[in-house]
């Protein structure tokens, strides 16, 4: 299965190609996407993205995980979370969300098994 491209991004709004739902924050993986609801894991801007936010995507067999930290990069990504992803044998890339979407789409367009989590506001 291929990773779906992100069709559009604006403040507080993301669309994934082939999906009728729009998201504020989202998770994408080969063959699917869904809302990234921070309440599920108790995530906040600080300390930031937790391994539990990423487990679902890592189970999908991605080779690369792209993390979008928000338009102003307010969402933190602790070193322990990066270490967790790397220990799973997955390359991890962290960017401001607009740049993260560009990188994710470039990898998806090449047919790579890429996943991502994207914060579309601050």
From Swiss-Prot:
UniProt-annotated location(s): Cytoplasm
SUPFAM superfamilies: MTH938-like
Region ranges (MTH138-like domain): 6-122
Alphabetical keyword list: Cytoplasm
CDD domains linked: Mth938 (cd05126)
Origin superkingdom: Eukaryota
GO cellular component entries: cytoplasm
GO biological process: positive regulation of fat cell differentiation
A Pfam family it matches: DUF498
Keyword Cytoplasm: yes
Protein family: Belongs to the AAMDC family.
This protein's name: Mth938 domain-containing protein
